[in-house]
Amino acid sequence: MWLDWLEAQSGGPALRVLALASQKGGSGKTTLSGHLAVQAQRAGAGPVVLIDIDPQGSLADWWNEREAELPAFAQTTVARLANDLAVLRQQGFKLAVLDTPPAITMAIQSVISVAELIVVPTRPSPHDLRAVGATVDLCERAGKPLIFVVNAATPKAKITSEAAVALSQHGTVAPITLHHRTDFAASMIDGRTVMEVDPESRSAAEVTALWKYIADRLEKNFRRTVFAAPNTQAAQPGAYRPAGGFGRRVAQ
């Protein structure tokens, strides 16, 4: 009932937009994007759609290996992103998960501008910690909330806790740490996730807990957005539909 009222105030069904961004390459954005989208779908937050803004197309390659149709995949461009999100909202999608390229580019700025929440995966290393500043600056300038996720951490290593403390000086740190295990990469080979390969694994438990935390933050942010700006602009008639719809495609 409460969510129905909020959606009515916002002009229709809500589409939450979650973006993963990091200046540092190799932070685990693509792996985490796929895992969060799948877990969100499994947890009932769907239908979920994945959007790959990274020109490397790694997320598209992974999705094309999947047997499950959901989460869906939408092909778009930075220039079309805002309008396509409006179309996806009209088509009934509830969550969009966006993967972005490394380095600070116009693409990342555009994604942050339309995202409701930005997740910044960060490995617990000095070089990775130093690289978060540019992403933080972009989020602050856009007035968008961010969450750091300590990723690929060594279990019980001192540097893991030190990284969380250092990141907390710049923003909120998720209370769930993702640890380095081979099952994350192994599960991605054939288009799956650790939750689908071994639901009882520690890695699956971490992703499940992380999504639950992020979902709670998305809900709170959505409520604030509705009360701050109750009348959002609807999609324009005849808006562009992403090329190829939401079926499979061969990534170039």
Which residues are covered by each model-predicted region?
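Beta-strand-loop-alpha "switch" segments that mediate conformational coupling across diverse proteins
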Residues: 154, 164-192
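Nucleotide-state-sensitive switch-loop elements of NTP-binding domains
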Residues: 43, 49-94
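Switch II (G3) loop of P-loop NTPases
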Residues: 54, 88-108, 123
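Walker A/P-loop phosphate-binding motif and the immediately C-terminal alpha-helix
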Residues: 14-55
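Conserved C-terminal guanine-recognition region of P-loop GTPase G domains, centered on the G4
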Residues: 129-151
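C-terminal boundary of histidine-terminating zinc-finger modules
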Residues: 188-209
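Extreme N-terminal, non-catalytic leader segments
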Residues: 1-19
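Conserved Switch II/interswitch segment of TRAFAC-class P-loop GTPases
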Residues: 112-132, 154-156
